[in-house]
Amino acid sequence: MATTADFKNGLVLKNEGKLQQIIEFQHVKPGKGPAFVRTKLKDVVTGKTIDKTWNAGVKVETATVDRRDVTYLYNDGTSFIVMDDKTFEQYELSPDAFGDAGRFLLENMRVQVSFHEGEALFGELPVSVDLRVEHTDPGLQGDRSTGGTKPATLETGAEIQVPLFIETGNVLKVDTRDGSYLSRVNN
């Protein structure tokens, strides 16, 4: 059990018979009336998000979630397949288990997966990953209509905006949280 004071991003709650993860929360203390907490919750099974308001100090049941390092193996078209690094057991995760960051997954990449009662729920990539540019148009020195960026397709198929000096074959450090270019990696 936890109270609303214990809320933090990533905490998994048992709410209305479902496992829901806190994506965002905000403590609000209005001038009149009692304090409350606004939350955005994501159902870990279906991926749907809902907004819920809690009275401050309310006790909430939390789920015991075990985070493990796993290796991403492949995408079979309907799910992501990962393998536990210690037991070598394989698990299936739904296509939205990694959220938008799933587009940066490479085979044999080390990721973290959260488990509840032996079932894989959702995964997290490292904050940044190094990926090779598969294709990008040459950047013209005088082209500033796009603010000094151009689209580039990475080896995973994801497309991001990169500076004009980036060329096909460069290895880039990419932020998996928002898909932004961080830096060019020296080869």
Swiss-Prot record:
Keywords: Cytoplasm, Elongation factor, Protein biosynthesis. SMART domains: EFP, Elong-fact-P_C. Transmembrane segments: none annotated. PROSITE patterns: EFP. The keyword Nucleotide-binding does not apply. One of its GO terms (cellular component) is cytoplasm. GO terms for biological process: peptide biosynthetic process. Pathway: Protein biosynthesis; polypeptide chain elongation. CDD domains: S1_EF-P_repeat_1, S1_EF-P_repeat_2. It is found in: Cytoplasm. GO terms for molecular function: translation elongation factor activity. The keyword Cytoplasm applies. InterPro entries: Elong-fact-P_C (IPR015365), NA-bd_OB-fold (IPR012340), Rib_uL2_dom2 (IPR014722), Transl_elong_fac_P/YeiP (IPR020599), Transl_elong_KOW-like (IPR013185), Transl_elong_P/YeiP_cen (IPR001059), Transl_elong_P/YeiP_CS (IPR013852), Transl_elongation_fac_P (IPR011768). PANTHER family: ELONGATION FACTOR P, ELONGATION FACTOR P (EF-P) FAMILY PROTEIN. Belongs to the elongation factor P family. Involved in peptide bond synthesis. Stimulates efficient translation and peptide-bond synthesis on native or reconstituted 70S ribosomes in vitro. Probably functions indirectly by altering the affinity of the ribosome for aminoacyl-tRNA, thus increasing their reactivity as acceptors for peptidyl transferase. This is Elongation factor P. It comes from Corynebacterium glutamicum (strain ATCC 13032 / DSM 20300 / JCM 1318 / BCRC 11384 / CCUG 27702 / LMG 3730 / NBRC 12168 / NCIMB 10025 / NRRL B-2784 / 534). The gene is efp.
